[in-house]
Amino acid sequence: MTGSKSVRNLTQGKIFSQILFFAIPVIIGNLLQELYNVVDTLIVGQTLGEIKLAAVGSTSSLNFFALGFFIGLSAGCSVITSQHFGAGNIKQIKKSVAAHILIGVISSAVLTVAFVFLVNPFLTMLGTTKETFDYASRYLTIIYLGIPATMLYNLTASLLRSVGDSKTPLYLLLFSSVLNVGLDLLFIVVFKWDVAGAAIATVVSQLISAVLCCIYICFKVKLLLPTKESFTSIGRMVADELKVGCPMGLQNSVISIGMMVLQYFVNQFGSYAVAGYTIGNRVQMLVQNPMNSISMVIATFAGQNEGAGKYDRIRKGVNYCLILCITYAIAVGALTMLFATPITGIFTSNSSQQTIDYSVQFIFWNCPFEFTLGMLFIYRGTIQGLKNGIIPMIGSLIEVLMRICAPVILSSIIGYISICVAGPAAWTASMLLMLAVYYIKMKGFKNKKALA
Protein backbone atom coordinates (compact mmCIF):
# COMPACT_ATOMS: atom_id res chain seq x y z
CA MET A 1 0.00 0.00 0.00
CA THR A 2 2.76 2.44 0.86
CA GLY A 3 4.98 2.42 -2.17
CA SER A 4 7.96 3.46 -0.05
CA LYS A 5 10.15 1.70 2.50
CA SER A 6 10.28 4.89 4.56
CA VAL A 7 6.56 4.75 5.31
CA ARG A 8 5.84 3.32 8.78
CA ASN A 9 2.63 1.68 9.99
CA LEU A 10 2.36 2.61 13.68
CA THR A 11 -0.56 0.28 14.35
CA GLN A 12 1.71 -2.79 14.46
CA GLY A 13 4.92 -3.87 16.20
CA LYS A 14 6.47 -3.06 19.56
CA ILE A 15 5.09 0.25 20.77
CA PHE A 16 8.20 1.72 22.40
CA SER A 17 10.55 0.93 19.51
CA GLN A 18 7.99 2.18 16.96
CA ILE A 19 7.62 5.48 18.82
CA LEU A 20 11.36 5.86 19.44
CA PHE A 21 12.47 5.17 15.86
CA PHE A 22 9.74 7.42 14.50
CA ALA A 23 10.49 10.16 17.04
CA ILE A 24 14.27 10.44 16.60
CA PRO A 25 14.14 11.88 13.05
CA VAL A 26 11.25 14.18 14.04
CA ILE A 27 13.21 15.47 17.04
CA ILE A 28 16.36 16.08 15.01
CA GLY A 29 14.35 17.68 12.21
CA ASN A 30 12.51 20.05 14.52
CA LEU A 31 15.75 20.96 16.27
CA LEU A 32 17.22 21.82 12.89
CA GLN A 33 14.17 23.93 12.08
CA GLU A 34 14.58 25.75 15.39
CA LEU A 35 18.25 26.23 14.52
CA TYR A 36 17.07 28.43 11.64
CA ASN A 37 16.08 30.99 14.27
CA VAL A 38 19.04 30.30 16.54
CA VAL A 39 21.55 30.76 13.72
CA ASP A 40 19.92 34.08 12.85
CA THR A 41 20.23 35.09 16.51
CA LEU A 42 23.85 33.99 16.77
CA ILE A 43 25.05 35.63 13.58
CA VAL A 44 23.03 38.82 14.08
CA GLY A 45 24.22 39.08 17.68
CA GLN A 46 27.86 38.39 16.87
CA THR A 47 28.12 40.56 13.75
CA LEU A 48 25.47 43.29 14.04
CA GLY A 49 25.29 43.93 17.80
CA GLU A 50 22.74 43.87 20.60
CA ILE A 51 20.34 46.48 19.17
CA LYS A 52 19.78 44.51 15.97
CA LEU A 53 19.66 41.29 17.98
CA ALA A 54 16.90 42.87 20.06
CA ALA A 55 15.14 43.90 16.82
CA VAL A 56 15.12 40.36 15.45
CA GLY A 57 14.18 38.95 18.85
CA SER A 58 11.29 41.35 19.31
CA THR A 59 9.60 39.86 16.21
CA SER A 60 9.53 36.27 17.51
CA SER A 61 5.96 36.39 18.84
CA LEU A 62 4.69 38.06 15.65
CA ASN A 63 6.64 35.54 13.60
CA PHE A 64 5.00 32.66 15.45
CA PHE A 65 1.58 34.32 15.22
CA ALA A 66 1.55 33.70 11.46
CA LEU A 67 3.91 30.78 10.97
CA GLY A 68 2.61 28.88 13.99
CA PHE A 69 -0.83 28.92 12.40
CA PHE A 70 0.44 27.04 9.35
CA ILE A 71 2.38 24.57 11.47
CA GLY A 72 -0.77 23.77 13.44
CA LEU A 73 -3.03 23.80 10.38
CA SER A 74 -0.77 21.35 8.52
CA ALA A 75 -0.43 19.05 11.52
CA GLY A 76 -4.19 19.07 12.07
CA CYS A 77 -5.07 18.36 8.45
CA SER A 78 -2.57 15.50 8.42
CA VAL A 79 -4.33 13.87 11.38
CA ILE A 80 -7.13 13.03 8.93
CA THR A 81 -4.59 11.56 6.49
CA SER A 82 -3.03 9.44 9.24
CA GLN A 83 -6.43 8.03 10.23
CA HIS A 84 -7.23 7.01 6.65
CA PHE A 85 -3.75 5.49 6.41
CA GLY A 86 -4.40 3.51 9.60
CA ALA A 87 -7.68 2.28 8.10
CA GLY A 88 -5.92 1.38 4.80
CA ASN A 89 -8.21 3.55 2.61
CA ILE A 90 -6.05 4.75 -0.32
CA LYS A 91 -8.82 6.71 -2.06
CA GLN A 92 -9.53 8.71 1.09
CA ILE A 93 -5.80 9.28 1.68
CA LYS A 94 -5.53 10.95 -1.73
CA LYS A 95 -8.68 13.01 -1.14
CA SER A 96 -7.29 14.20 2.20
CA VAL A 97 -4.08 15.32 0.46
CA ALA A 98 -6.11 17.19 -2.18
CA ALA A 99 -8.09 18.95 0.55
CA HIS A 100 -4.85 19.78 2.37
CA ILE A 101 -3.39 21.38 -0.77
CA LEU A 102 -6.53 23.44 -1.38
CA ILE A 103 -6.60 24.70 2.21
CA GLY A 104 -2.87 25.50 2.18
CA VAL A 105 -2.87 27.48 -1.07
CA ILE A 106 -5.87 29.64 -0.19
CA SER A 107 -4.88 30.33 3.42
CA SER A 108 -1.25 31.17 2.62
CA ALA A 109 -2.21 33.56 -0.20
CA VAL A 110 -4.73 35.45 1.93
CA LEU A 111 -2.61 35.64 5.08
CA THR A 112 0.60 36.64 3.27
CA VAL A 113 -1.04 39.77 1.87
CA ALA A 114 -2.79 40.59 5.15
CA PHE A 115 0.24 40.17 7.41
CA VAL A 116 2.65 42.09 5.18
CA PHE A 117 0.39 45.15 5.40
CA LEU A 118 0.04 44.74 9.17
CA VAL A 119 3.76 44.58 10.04
CA ASN A 120 4.16 48.16 11.28
CA PRO A 121 0.81 48.30 13.13
CA PHE A 122 1.76 45.04 14.87
CA LEU A 123 5.16 46.39 15.95
CA THR A 124 3.61 49.65 17.15
CA MET A 125 1.00 47.72 19.13
CA LEU A 126 3.79 45.79 20.90
CA GLY A 127 5.55 49.00 21.92
CA THR A 128 8.70 48.14 19.93
CA THR A 129 11.51 50.49 20.95
CA LYS A 130 12.43 53.34 18.61
CA GLU A 131 16.00 52.14 18.06
CA THR A 132 14.86 48.65 16.97
CA PHE A 133 11.65 49.46 15.05
CA ASP A 134 13.02 49.86 11.50
CA TYR A 135 15.21 46.76 11.75
CA ALA A 136 12.34 44.70 13.16
CA SER A 137 9.99 45.91 10.41
CA ARG A 138 12.45 45.00 7.66
CA TYR A 139 13.07 41.53 9.09
CA LEU A 140 9.42 40.67 9.73
CA THR A 141 8.21 41.87 6.32
CA ILE A 142 10.54 39.44 4.57
CA ILE A 143 9.57 36.58 6.90
CA TYR A 144 5.89 37.22 6.16
CA LEU A 145 6.55 37.31 2.40
CA GLY A 146 7.99 33.82 2.88
CA ILE A 147 4.76 32.42 4.36
CA PRO A 148 4.01 30.34 1.20
CA ALA A 149 7.40 28.63 1.56
CA THR A 150 6.67 27.84 5.20
CA MET A 151 3.22 26.53 4.29
CA LEU A 152 4.60 24.30 1.54
CA TYR A 153 7.30 22.78 3.74
CA ASN A 154 4.96 22.13 6.66
CA LEU A 155 2.31 20.68 4.35
CA THR A 156 4.67 18.19 2.69
CA ALA A 157 6.57 17.29 5.87
CA SER A 158 3.38 16.72 7.88
CA LEU A 159 1.94 14.53 5.12
CA LEU A 160 5.06 12.37 5.11
CA ARG A 161 4.90 12.05 8.90
CA SER A 162 1.20 11.13 8.71
CA VAL A 163 2.16 7.92 6.89
CA GLY A 164 5.02 7.22 9.29
CA ASP A 165 7.91 8.69 7.27
CA SER A 166 9.89 10.91 9.62
CA LYS A 167 13.32 10.32 8.06
CA THR A 168 12.86 12.06 4.73
CA PRO A 169 11.86 15.46 6.20
CA LEU A 170 14.93 15.16 8.43
CA TYR A 171 17.37 14.55 5.57
CA LEU A 172 15.97 17.41 3.52
CA LEU A 173 15.92 19.75 6.50
CA LEU A 174 19.52 18.86 7.35
CA PHE A 175 20.57 19.98 3.88
CA SER A 176 18.47 23.11 4.20
CA SER A 177 19.91 23.96 7.63
CA VAL A 178 23.48 23.79 6.36
CA LEU A 179 22.41 25.98 3.45
CA ASN A 180 20.80 28.42 5.88
CA VAL A 181 24.06 28.87 7.79
CA GLY A 182 25.95 29.48 4.57
CA LEU A 183 23.39 31.97 3.27
CA ASP A 184 23.33 33.79 6.63
CA LEU A 185 27.07 34.31 6.47
CA LEU A 186 26.94 35.24 2.78
CA PHE A 187 24.08 37.73 3.05
CA ILE A 188 25.04 39.31 6.39
CA VAL A 189 28.85 39.17 6.49
CA VAL A 190 29.77 39.32 2.78
CA PHE A 191 26.88 41.17 1.11
CA LYS A 192 26.20 43.38 4.19
CA TRP A 193 22.43 42.96 3.87
CA ASP A 194 22.01 43.50 7.60
CA VAL A 195 18.95 41.94 9.32
CA ALA A 196 17.26 41.55 5.93
CA GLY A 197 19.95 39.03 5.01
CA ALA A 198 19.04 36.84 7.98
CA ALA A 199 15.38 36.84 6.97
CA ILE A 200 16.11 36.11 3.30
CA ALA A 201 18.40 33.22 4.26
CA THR A 202 15.66 31.66 6.39
CA VAL A 203 12.99 31.96 3.68
CA VAL A 204 15.20 30.66 0.86
CA SER A 205 16.39 27.71 2.93
CA GLN A 206 12.86 26.69 3.85
CA LEU A 207 11.66 27.06 0.26
CA ILE A 208 14.39 24.74 -1.01
CA SER A 209 13.52 22.18 1.67
CA ALA A 210 9.85 22.34 0.63
CA VAL A 211 10.61 21.89 -3.07
CA LEU A 212 12.82 18.88 -2.34
CA CYS A 213 10.02 17.38 -0.22
CA CYS A 214 7.60 17.76 -3.14
CA ILE A 215 10.02 16.09 -5.54
CA TYR A 216 10.51 13.19 -3.13
CA ILE A 217 6.76 12.63 -2.77
CA CYS A 218 6.28 12.68 -6.55
CA PHE A 219 8.85 9.95 -7.11
CA LYS A 220 8.88 7.88 -3.92
CA VAL A 221 5.55 8.22 -2.06
CA LYS A 222 2.94 8.16 -4.82
CA LEU A 223 0.41 7.14 -2.20
CA LEU A 224 0.33 10.88 -1.32
CA LEU A 225 -0.15 12.06 -4.92
CA PRO A 226 -3.76 13.12 -5.49
CA THR A 227 -5.42 12.45 -8.85
CA LYS A 228 -7.82 14.75 -10.71
CA GLU A 229 -10.64 12.72 -9.21
CA SER A 230 -9.27 13.44 -5.73
CA PHE A 231 -10.16 17.13 -6.14
CA THR A 232 -13.81 16.40 -6.94
CA SER A 233 -16.48 16.31 -4.25
CA ILE A 234 -14.01 17.10 -1.46
CA GLY A 235 -16.20 19.56 0.44
CA ARG A 236 -16.74 17.06 3.26
CA MET A 237 -13.02 16.26 3.42
CA VAL A 238 -12.11 19.96 3.53
CA ALA A 239 -14.61 20.44 6.35
CA ASP A 240 -13.17 17.46 8.27
CA GLU A 241 -9.62 18.80 7.92
CA LEU A 242 -10.61 22.34 8.89
CA LYS A 243 -12.46 20.95 11.91
CA VAL A 244 -9.16 19.61 13.25
CA GLY A 245 -6.62 21.86 11.51
CA CYS A 246 -8.14 25.28 12.25
CA PRO A 247 -8.28 24.79 16.03
CA MET A 248 -4.68 23.52 15.99
CA GLY A 249 -3.56 26.46 13.87
CA LEU A 250 -5.53 28.95 15.95
CA GLN A 251 -4.15 27.31 19.08
CA ASN A 252 -0.64 28.34 18.03
CA SER A 253 -1.80 31.82 17.04
CA VAL A 254 -3.67 32.24 20.32
CA ILE A 255 -0.55 31.19 22.25
CA SER A 256 1.41 33.77 20.27
CA ILE A 257 -1.03 36.47 21.41
CA GLY A 258 0.04 35.70 24.96
CA MET A 259 3.65 35.91 23.76
CA MET A 260 2.90 39.31 22.21
CA VAL A 261 1.51 40.63 25.47
CA LEU A 262 4.59 39.29 27.19
CA GLN A 263 6.80 40.96 24.56
CA TYR A 264 5.02 44.25 25.24
CA PHE A 265 5.95 44.04 28.92
CA VAL A 266 9.52 42.96 28.09
CA ASN A 267 9.87 46.00 25.82
CA GLN A 268 9.08 48.23 28.81
CA PHE A 269 12.28 47.05 30.52
CA GLY A 270 14.48 48.36 27.65
CA SER A 271 16.74 46.94 24.92
CA TYR A 272 19.02 44.98 27.28
CA ALA A 273 16.02 43.15 28.72
CA VAL A 274 14.72 42.47 25.19
CA ALA A 275 18.12 41.07 24.15
CA GLY A 276 18.39 38.96 27.32
CA TYR A 277 14.83 37.68 26.95
CA THR A 278 15.50 36.88 23.29
CA ILE A 279 18.55 34.78 24.16
CA GLY A 280 16.85 33.05 27.09
CA ASN A 281 13.79 32.30 24.98
CA ARG A 282 15.89 30.85 22.16
CA VAL A 283 17.69 28.56 24.62
CA GLN A 284 14.38 27.44 26.12
CA MET A 285 12.88 26.76 22.70
CA LEU A 286 15.81 24.50 21.88
CA VAL A 287 15.34 22.67 25.18
CA GLN A 288 11.60 22.30 24.57
CA ASN A 289 11.82 21.26 20.93
CA PRO A 290 12.37 17.50 21.47
CA MET A 291 9.31 17.35 23.74
CA ASN A 292 7.24 19.20 21.15
CA SER A 293 8.50 16.71 18.56
CA ILE A 294 7.32 13.77 20.66
CA SER A 295 3.94 15.51 20.82
CA MET A 296 3.81 15.43 17.02
CA VAL A 297 4.74 11.74 17.10
CA ILE A 298 2.00 10.80 19.58
CA ALA A 299 -0.55 12.73 17.50
CA THR A 300 0.31 10.61 14.44
CA PHE A 301 0.48 7.46 16.58
CA ALA A 302 -2.93 8.15 18.14
CA GLY A 303 -4.45 9.02 14.76
CA GLN A 304 -3.29 5.84 13.04
CA ASN A 305 -4.30 3.61 15.96
CA GLU A 306 -7.72 5.19 16.35
CA GLY A 307 -8.25 4.56 12.64
CA ALA A 308 -7.37 0.91 13.30
CA GLY A 309 -9.51 0.78 16.48
CA LYS A 310 -6.53 -0.03 18.73
CA TYR A 311 -7.32 2.11 21.77
CA ASP A 312 -5.25 0.22 24.35
CA ARG A 313 -2.22 0.73 22.13
CA ILE A 314 -2.83 4.50 22.31
CA ARG A 315 -2.81 4.44 26.13
CA LYS A 316 0.46 2.49 26.25
CA GLY A 317 2.03 4.84 23.71
CA VAL A 318 1.08 7.87 25.80
CA ASN A 319 2.68 6.33 28.90
CA TYR A 320 5.94 5.68 27.05
CA CYS A 321 5.99 9.25 25.71
CA LEU A 322 5.38 10.68 29.18
CA ILE A 323 8.36 8.75 30.55
CA LEU A 324 10.55 10.00 27.69
CA CYS A 325 9.50 13.64 28.10
CA ILE A 326 9.71 13.84 31.89
CA THR A 327 13.13 12.12 32.00
CA TYR A 328 14.44 14.41 29.27
CA ALA A 329 13.02 17.57 30.89
CA ILE A 330 14.63 16.90 34.26
CA ALA A 331 18.04 15.94 32.83
CA VAL A 332 18.38 18.64 30.17
CA GLY A 333 16.78 21.30 32.36
CA ALA A 334 19.39 20.69 35.05
CA LEU A 335 22.26 20.85 32.54
CA THR A 336 20.91 24.06 31.01
CA MET A 337 20.74 25.73 34.41
CA LEU A 338 24.27 24.55 35.23
CA PHE A 339 25.73 26.08 32.07
CA ALA A 340 23.31 29.01 31.67
CA THR A 341 25.96 31.76 31.79
CA PRO A 342 28.38 30.31 29.18
CA ILE A 343 25.44 29.36 26.94
CA THR A 344 24.18 32.94 27.06
CA GLY A 345 27.63 34.26 26.21
CA ILE A 346 27.68 32.31 22.93
CA PHE A 347 24.95 34.46 21.41
CA THR A 348 26.62 37.89 21.50
CA SER A 349 30.11 39.31 21.34
CA ASN A 350 30.98 41.82 24.08
CA SER A 351 27.53 41.37 25.58
CA SER A 352 26.72 43.55 28.55
CA GLN A 353 26.38 42.01 32.00
CA GLN A 354 22.79 43.28 32.04
CA THR A 355 21.89 41.21 28.98
CA ILE A 356 23.52 38.10 30.48
CA ASP A 357 21.73 38.60 33.80
CA TYR A 358 18.32 38.95 32.15
CA SER A 359 18.92 35.82 30.06
CA VAL A 360 20.19 33.64 32.93
CA GLN A 361 17.32 34.75 35.16
CA PHE A 362 14.80 33.70 32.50
CA ILE A 363 16.45 30.29 32.13
CA PHE A 364 16.56 29.68 35.89
CA TRP A 365 12.84 30.36 36.32
CA ASN A 366 11.77 28.21 33.33
CA CYS A 367 13.93 25.08 33.45
CA PRO A 368 12.52 23.59 36.70
CA PHE A 369 9.05 23.51 35.12
CA GLU A 370 9.97 21.93 31.77
CA PHE A 371 8.55 18.56 32.85
CA THR A 372 5.12 20.21 33.16
CA LEU A 373 5.40 21.45 29.59
CA GLY A 374 6.39 17.95 28.47
CA MET A 375 3.22 16.51 30.01
CA LEU A 376 1.17 19.25 28.34
CA PHE A 377 2.68 18.42 24.94
CA ILE A 378 1.90 14.70 25.24
CA TYR A 379 -1.68 14.98 26.47
CA ARG A 380 -2.45 17.76 23.99
CA GLY A 381 -0.89 15.88 21.07
CA THR A 382 -2.90 12.77 21.90
CA ILE A 383 -6.16 14.69 22.08
CA GLN A 384 -5.38 16.36 18.73
CA GLY A 385 -4.55 12.97 17.19
CA LEU A 386 -8.02 11.81 18.24
CA LYS A 387 -9.56 14.58 16.10
CA ASN A 388 -10.45 16.90 18.97
CA GLY A 389 -9.10 20.37 18.21
CA ILE A 390 -11.47 22.39 20.40
CA ILE A 391 -10.15 21.33 23.82
CA PRO A 392 -6.50 22.14 22.94
CA MET A 393 -7.64 25.55 21.70
CA ILE A 394 -9.43 26.16 25.02
CA GLY A 395 -6.17 25.15 26.70
CA SER A 396 -4.40 27.75 24.59
CA LEU A 397 -6.83 30.43 25.74
CA ILE A 398 -6.02 29.47 29.33
CA GLU A 399 -2.31 29.82 28.49
CA VAL A 400 -2.90 33.29 27.08
CA LEU A 401 -4.81 34.31 30.17
CA MET A 402 -1.99 33.15 32.44
CA ARG A 403 0.69 34.83 30.29
CA ILE A 404 -1.24 38.09 30.51
CA CYS A 405 -2.11 37.87 34.20
CA ALA A 406 1.45 37.19 35.39
CA PRO A 407 3.03 40.48 34.19
CA VAL A 408 -0.15 42.54 34.67
CA ILE A 409 -0.47 41.53 38.32
CA LEU A 410 3.17 40.99 39.26
CA SER A 411 5.34 43.33 37.15
CA SER A 412 4.97 46.21 39.60
CA ILE A 413 5.90 43.89 42.48
CA ILE A 414 8.67 41.60 41.17
CA GLY A 415 9.59 43.35 37.90
CA TYR A 416 11.25 41.23 35.21
CA ILE A 417 10.64 38.00 37.18
CA SER A 418 6.95 38.35 36.28
CA ILE A 419 8.02 37.76 32.67
CA CYS A 420 9.98 34.68 33.68
CA VAL A 421 7.14 32.97 35.59
CA ALA A 422 4.45 33.63 32.96
CA GLY A 423 5.38 30.56 30.89
CA PRO A 424 5.44 28.01 33.73
CA ALA A 425 2.11 29.31 35.04
CA ALA A 426 0.55 28.96 31.58
CA TRP A 427 1.91 25.42 31.05
CA THR A 428 0.67 24.17 34.40
CA ALA A 429 -2.87 25.50 34.02
CA SER A 430 -3.29 24.16 30.47
CA MET A 431 -1.72 20.79 31.34
CA LEU A 432 -4.26 20.16 34.11
CA LEU A 433 -7.11 20.62 31.60
CA MET A 434 -5.48 18.29 29.03
CA LEU A 435 -4.84 15.69 31.73
CA ALA A 436 -8.51 15.63 32.75
CA VAL A 437 -9.79 15.44 29.16
CA TYR A 438 -7.32 12.68 28.26
CA TYR A 439 -8.47 10.42 31.09
CA ILE A 440 -12.13 11.06 30.25
CA LYS A 441 -11.42 10.01 26.64
CA MET A 442 -9.52 6.89 27.71
CA LYS A 443 -12.42 5.90 29.97
CA GLY A 444 -14.77 6.36 27.02
CA PHE A 445 -12.65 4.07 24.84
CA LYS A 446 -12.59 1.46 27.61
CA ASN A 447 -16.38 1.52 27.85
CA LYS A 448 -16.67 1.38 24.06
CA LYS A 449 -14.43 -1.69 23.97
CA ALA A 450 -16.44 -3.37 26.76
CA LEU A 451 -19.71 -2.81 24.88
CA ALA A 452 -18.18 -4.26 21.71
Regions found by a protein language model. Give the residues of each.
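Short alpha-helical transmembrane segments in multi-pass integral membrane proteins
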Residues: 1-23, 81-146, 190-246, 302-369, ...
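Residue-level signal for short hydrophobic patches within transmembrane helices
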Residues: 12, 16-35, 39, 62, ...
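Transmembrane helical elements of multi-pass membrane transporters/channels
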Residues: 21-40, 142, 153, 176, ...
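Transmembrane alpha-helix boundary and packing residues in multipass membrane permease domains
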Residues: 26, 30, 42, 79, ...
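Helix-terminus/linker motif at the lipid-water interface of multi-pass membrane proteins
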Residues: 35-54, 123-130, 186-193, 253-286, ...
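Small-residue-rich hydrophobic transmembrane alpha-helices
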Residues: 53-113, 150-169, 276-340, 373-395
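Hydrophobic transmembrane alpha-helices of multi-pass small-molecule transporters
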Residues: 65, 180-185, 210-214, 286-289, ...
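Short runs within selected transmembrane alpha-helices of multi-pass transporters and secretion channels
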Residues: 74, 143-161, 169-177, 198-213, ...
